[in-house]
């Protein structure tokens, strides 16, 4: 009887003779023919990763992409090293590493924190946007919420001519950028 096992174009079978179908991940990418396995490190969606032998996850906050032999290190706020052939699916949400991966949890460096909500002026709270959080961390930021600033209000009458005691507003960063753009200084 002829063996059809390792012929090109033939159907791959598992150890029990059952046909193996091509498997795809949630993004439609083929998961490879290496089967399943932890590959020595923990995947980011659970206790085990899907071993592909040739693909792993790259670096970054979301961690999508491919690495050499499945080795990669997360460089976001919480990154995880993977073992050989481990594959990353989903966002990096684990806080512990299971197995013999390359690295553990990467700790945040730097100082300072920003609250995720602020007073809305009506006795309640509202969530801050990412741009507001970034602006708070920049040097020269002055919190203007809850403070009414009267700039350029009434003059003394003598300064109405324009010379002498003109009061200039401090320009914001966006105003400075707009001035440098062609046609933006109107």
Swiss-Prot record:
UniProt keywords, alphabetically:
Stress response
Locate the compositionally biased regions of type Low complexity.
Answer: 105-116
> Which organism encodes this protein?
Arabidopsis thaliana (Mouse-ear cress)
Q: Which InterPro entries match?
A: Dehydrin, Dehydrin_CS
> One GO BP annotation here?
cold acclimation
Q: What spans are recorded as compositionally biased (Basic and acidic residues)?
A: 89-98, 133-144, 165-186
Q: Name one GO molecular function term.
A: metal ion binding
GO cellular component terms, alphabetically, are: cytosol
Q: What is this protein called?
A: Dehydrin Rab18
So what family is this one in?
Answer: Belongs to the plant dehydrin family.
For region Disordered, the annotated ranges are: 1-186
One Pfam family name from the record?
Answer: Dehydrin
Biased amino acid composition, Gly residues? 30-85, 152-164
Q: Which PROSITE patterns match?
A: DEHYDRIN_1, DEHYDRIN_2
Summarize the record's induction comment.
By water stress and abscisic acid (ABA) during the cold acclimation process.
């Amino acid at each position: 009887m002829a063996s059809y096992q390792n012929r090109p174009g033939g159907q791959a079978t598992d150890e029990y003779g059952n046909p193996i179908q091509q498997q795809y991940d949630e993004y439609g990418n083929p998961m490879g023919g290496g089967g399943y396995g932890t590959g020595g490190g923990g995947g980011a969606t659970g206790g085990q990763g899907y071993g592909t032998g040739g693909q792993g996850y790259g670096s970054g906050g979301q961690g999508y992409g491919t690495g050499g032999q499945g080795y990669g290190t997360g460089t976001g706020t919480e990154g995880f090293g993977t073992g050989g052939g481990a594959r990353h699916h989903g966002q990096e949400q684990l806080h512990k590493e299971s197995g013999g991966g390359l690295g553990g949890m990467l700790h945040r460096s730097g100082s300072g924190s920003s609250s995720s909500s602020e007073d809305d002026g009506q006795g309640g709270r509202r969530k801050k946007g990412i741009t507001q959080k970034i602006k708070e961390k920049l040097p020269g930021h002055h919190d203007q919420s809850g403070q009414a600033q009267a700039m350029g209000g009434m003059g003394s009458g003598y300064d109405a001519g324009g010379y002498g005691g003109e009061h200039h507003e401090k320009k914001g960063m966006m105003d400075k950028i707009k001035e440098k753009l062609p046609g933006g200084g109107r």
